[in-house]
C-alpha cells in the first residue's frame, strides 16, 4: 500500500538537515543513514548517501531518476547465491 497523499513523504529530519547543509556549503560528503524508509527528495540529487543494509553501509549516488523512491530500494539486504541447478563436473 502506498502512503496517503495528504500525509506527504517521510524524510528523516536529521538526514534532511545534513543534505540541506551540504547544499548551502557546497561540500560533497558521504552521509551515513539507517533510515531506509526515507523518500528521496530533489535536494538529494548529486549527493552520495550510505544506506545501511543490516550488515554494512552501501553507498548510493542519487540521480534524478531516483527522486520519489525510497533509499532502501537501492541497498539490497539479501545476497543472491543463485538457484540450485545441475553441478557441472
Curated annotation (Swiss-Prot):
Q: Which InterPro entries match?
A: Ribosomal_uS19, Ribosomal_uS19_bac-type, Ribosomal_uS19_CS, Ribosomal_uS19_SF
Q: Name one GO molecular function term.
A: structural constituent of ribosome
Superkingdom, natural source? Bacteria
Task: Please name the SUPFAM superfamilies in this protein's record.
Answer: Ribosomal protein S19 (SSF54570)
Pfam families in the record: Ribosomal_S19 (PF00203)
Gene Ontology CC, one term: small ribosomal subunit
Q: Which keywords, in A-to-Z order, does the entry hold?
A: Ribonucleoprotein, Ribosomal protein, RNA-binding, rRNA-binding
Query: Mind listing the GO biological process terms from this record?
Result: ribosomal small subunit assembly; translation
Task: Quote the PANTHER family the UniProt record gives.
Answer: RIBOSOMAL PROTEIN S19P FAMILY MEMBER, SMALL RIBOSOMAL SUBUNIT PROTEIN US19M
Tell me, in a sentence or two, what this protein's role is. Protein S19 forms a complex with S13 that binds strongly to the 16S ribosomal RNA.
Of which family is this protein a member? Belongs to the universal ribosomal protein uS19 family.
Q: State the name under which the record lists this protein.
A: Small ribosomal subunit protein uS19
The gene from which this protein is expressed is rpsS
